[in-house]
Design a protein with these regions (language model features):
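Conserved acidic carboxylate
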Residues: 7
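Short amphipathic alpha-helix used as the core "switch/output" element in two-component signaling
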Residues: 62-73, 94
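Acidic, metal-coordinating helix/loop segments flanking the phosphotransfer/catalytic sites
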Residues: 31-49
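Acidic catalytic/metal-coordinating carboxylates
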Residues: 34, 60-63
Length: 143
């Protein structure tokens, strides 16, 4: 399979890319250091799965997700983040993200997530679901 990895922290991006390339079913891992570079790579390279960080320079992972779903809807998208912010998660789900998971996971778990989304299923970290279920969004006085 062909993957795109968009992560602005170079050490993390390089390490994750190397670990993914060791997997027997991974053919290539394209690397992008920001959202703009990710979109440029997607315009010239066919990928099966895009693995995106949320907060990146120029274009966020959420911006890239929305671009992919509009221009290359066959590409599966996994958001990998440290942020448990409900607003990010809600925007990603609204944009039809295939998986939204936390960075505190092993390569084996990430590979399971990749295979899950390639099989047409969704995956969301339980910790994120818990935040969503307990997130209070009170109405303003005007509402």
């Amino acid at each position: 399979m062909k993957l795109l990895l968009a992560e602005d922290q170079s050490m993390l991006r390089d390490a994750l890319s190397q670990l993914l390339q060791l997997q027997p079913d991974v053919e290539v891992v394209y690397q992008a250091e920001d959202g703009r570079e990710a979109m440029e790579l997607l315009k010239t390279n066919l990928v099966d799965v895009a693995i995106l960080d949320v907060e990146m320079p120029y274009q966020t992972g959420l911006d890239v997700l929305e671009w992919i779903k509009e221009h290359q809807p066959v590409v599966k998208v996994i958001i990998v983040t440290t942020f448990k912010r409900p607003g990010y998660f809600e925007r990603a789900v609204k944009a039809d993200v295939d998986a939204y998971v936390l960075k505190e996971r092993s390569i084996a778990d990430l590979m399971k997530t990749i295979h899950t989304v390639l099989a047409g299923q969704k995956e969301y970290s339980p910790e994120l679901m818990e935040v969503m279920m307990t997130h209070k969004n009170p109405l303003s006085h005007q509402e």
